[in-house]
From Swiss-Prot:
Subcellular locations according to the entry: Cytoplasm, Cytosol; Cytoplasm, Cytoskeleton, Microtubule organizing center, Centrosome; Cytoplasm, Cytoskeleton, Spindle; Nucleus
UniProt GO BP: cell division; mitotic sister chromatid segregation; mitotic spindle assembly checkpoint signaling; protein monoubiquitination
Subunit structure, as described in the record: Component of the BCR(KLHL22) E3 ubiquitin ligase complex, at least composed of cul3, klhl22 and rbx1.
Pathway(s) where this gene product acts: Protein modification; protein ubiquitination
SMART domains for this protein: BACK, BTB, Kelch
Region (Disordered): 1-25
Protein keywords: Cell cycle, Cell division, Cytoplasm, Cytoskeleton, Kelch repeat, Lysosome, Mitosis, Nucleus, Repeat, Ubl conjugation pathway
Name the UniProt record assigns to this protein: Kelch-like protein 22
Stretches assigned to the BTB domain: 50-117
Length: 641
């Protein structure tokens, strides 16, 4: 055949296929690495090409030097780092048992590690010395799978000896999750004081109420029997009581504790907690470390709204998006107002619902206002506004709430009221430059931006900026699209206008264009449009994403249950978990909810929790609450309801 090729004429030689210039492609085999490892195992099993002998406890283990050097830093330094072992046929390994070394070698060759209660500690010791991180993690995972209240103390000691921070965190998770039962044991009292103090300070402590934290702090110094018989001296406050968030304890328990205490530092602490309870309207501006909810769960929460069926029924439901399950769940919140299209704002994890539409016997604008505290799942009615308002916007600037414009179904408004939680009063500030309703607002860098809306039958593009220090409004660049009954959100130094409707085509239609405003340049740009219409939506910002909840689609002619989520960094929309009902006028925000609310289900797993926590560690500081303007359609266009 070779001779035939040599005698072939140039015109008869195989031609190079004609391919486009610069054509290339890289292929990767999914099986190659496993086949390579299997080949090395075959060499080991056949005793072929061994070039080093490890001497462990006087016994020999033959191996391939190149594989050991590739497997971990310990052997890489030994065989490729210029040490004398590079040229030695036999190498002594000290401080490791022969049986543990055999298991390590099996792992290096096969990726499999056989662990048991009897061998895990010696395997962990060997893995730590040889610096094989995967084996260390497997050992830690195995130990955690067997942790209980009897052995957790020994495992803490083991983690401390080998500086296993991940194991320590996993043990902390076990204690925090089982704190109520574990704090009743003798093992609890044998933990170091600093460790217990750290656990009691944690937001991950699983307790039903702060009363249990107080009891847990005392149980470190006293037995359950002593607590039951009230054989406790609090003249010298135990250090652990500094971790108790007394303002979050039940008022009745605080009062009893105060009454029985003599003059001591603890009585002063309890008195301050009682003052917090008694100044209910001021609680949002009395916040500090000892009033923070014990939770790391930031959740999108929706309040109220109106269903499609039964006919124009107002909702008093509160729903939250469970981040562990990825689905909407009811939030237990008795005495919630039955309203729609309320202004909503969050101040220090207290949510305010301002005015709105009480459509019980025809449209009626509300002046009443409510506040919800997720710490105790309690509603509190604050002072009513001086004017009833529907189709309004609400923002928080500093410690104040601002209710902007709207209408009362007799007149459109331009007046702006400011709520002071220190005095529980409303006062007028500088009015908007024109009457408007069905607009939207958002706060950014200490200023409030109000955009679009409707005046009479005209849809607007106007955008205004309010400076609270000067109490002045200024016009800024016009929005590129007219709209009303839309949402607005601030994210990453920009403001987004989302959803709503207009009549630019001579009839009511959805606005799908999403506009983005930069205060630095005073310019609007259009970004990726909505996948579907959202009039009167709920809007909330969480983890650098904008959630758009339900609302009304004029193109479809009905209310909706779909949820869309916008990721600004990718300029991309994705579907979110659907609501349980078609609903419009839902007021939405982001709240930190108690762990007990989310953990009160037999569906979630520890794996779900860890998947949630990994990204949350990086995003917790960025979680923000942005008020939505989920506004009703005007009376003239309400016939379809």
């Amino acid at each position: 055949m070779a001779e035939d090729l040599e005698t072939m004429k140039p015109s008869q030689a195989p031609q190079q296929p004609s391919l486009p210039q610069g054509s290339s492609k890289t292929y990767r085999s999914a099986e190659h690495s496993q086949a390579l490892l299997s080949g090395l195992v075959a060499l080991r099993d056949s005793g072929i090409l061994f070039d080093v002998v490890l001497k462990v406890e006087g016994k020999s283990i033959e191996a391939h030097r190149i594989l050991l050097a590739a497997s971990c830093d310990y052997f890489r330094g030994m065989f490729a780092g210029g040490l004398k072992e590079m040229d030695q046929r036999e190498v002594q390994i000290h401080g490791v048992s022969y049986s543990a070394m055999c298991r390590i070698m099996d792992f290096i060759y096969t990726s499999d590690l056989a662990l048991s209660v009897n061998n895990v500690q010696e395997t962990l010791t060997a893995a730590c010395q040889l610096q094989i991180s995967e084996v260390i993690q497997f050992c830690c995972d195995f130990l955690v799978s067997w942790v209980d209240e009897e052995n957790v103390l020994e495992l803490y000691k083991l983690a401390d000896i080998f500086h296993l921070n991940r194991l320590t965190e996993q043990l902390d998770t076990f204690v925090l999750k089982n704190f109520i039962t574990f704090s009743q044991t003798q093992m609890y009292r044998q933990l170091p004081l600093d460790k217990v103090f750290s656990l009691l300070n944690s937001n991950r402590l699983e307790v039903a109420s702060e009363n249990e934290v107080y009891e847990g702090a005392l149980l470190y110094h006293y037995t359950p029997e002593q607590l039951e018989k009230d054989q406790v001296s609090l003249l010298e406050s135990p250090k652990l009581l500094e971790a108790v968030r007394f303002p979050l304890m039940d008022l009745a328990i605080l009062q009893r504790l105060h009454d029985k205490l003599g003059l001591c530092p603890l009585k002063t602490t309890v008195l301050k907690a009682l003052e917090y309870h008694k100044n209910e309207s001021m609680q949002p501006v009395m916040q500090g470390p000892n009033t923070q909810l014990r939770s790391e769960f930031h959740c999108v929460v929706g309040f109220g709204g109106m269903y499609s069926a039964p006919y124009t029924v107002l909702s008093d439901q509160v729903k939250y998006l469970n981040p562990l399950l990825g689905e909407w769940r009811p939030l237990t919140a008795p005495h919630a107002p039955r309203m729609s299209n309320q202004g909503i704002a969050v101040l220090n994890n207290f949510v305010y619902l301002i005015g709105g539409d009480n459509n019980v016997r025809g449209y009626r604008a509300e002046a009443r206002c409510w506040r919800y505290d997720p710490r105790h799942s309690r509603w509190f009615q604050i002072q009513s506004m001086q004017q009833p308002r529907a189709d309004l916007s609400v923002c928080v600037l500093g410690d104040f709430l601002y209710a902007v414009a709207g209408r009362d179904y007799h007149d459109e408004l331009k007046e702006v009221e400011r709520y002071d939680p220190f005095t529980n009063t409303w006062e007028y500030v500088a009015p908007l430059q024109k009457q408007v309703h069905a607009h939207a607002a958002a706060a950014l860098d200490g200023r409030m931006y109000v955009a679009c809306g409707r005046r009479g039958n005209t849809y607007l593009k106007d955008t205004f900026c309010y400076d609270p220090e000067r109490d002045q409004w200024a016009s800024v660049a016009l929005s590129p699209v007219r709209r009303a009954w839309h949402g607005m959100a601030a994210l990453q130094e920009k403001i987004y206008l989302i959803g709503g409707s207009n009549d630019d085509e001579g009839f009511r239609q959805d606005v799908l264009e999403v506009a983005c405003y930069s205060p630095k340049t005073d310019q609007w740009t259009l970004v990726s449009p909505l996948p579907a219409g959202h009039g009167e939506p709920g809007i909330a910002v969480l983890a650098k994403k904008i959630f758009v909840l339900g609302g009304r689609s004029h193109n479809q002619g009905d209310r909706t249950d779909y949820v869309h989520v916008y990721e600004a960094e990718r300029d991309y929309w994705e579907d979110g978990p659907r609501l349980e009902d078609d609903i419009s006028g839902m007021a939405a925000c982001v709240l930190t909810l108690p762990r007990s609310v989310l953990m009160d289900t037999d569906v979630w797993t520890q794996e779900m929790y860890m998947q949630y926590m990994d990204p949350v560690q990086n995003l917790a500081d960025n979680a923000s609450e942005v008020m939505s303007v989920s506004d009703w359609e005007d009376l003239d266009n309400s016939g379809e309801d």
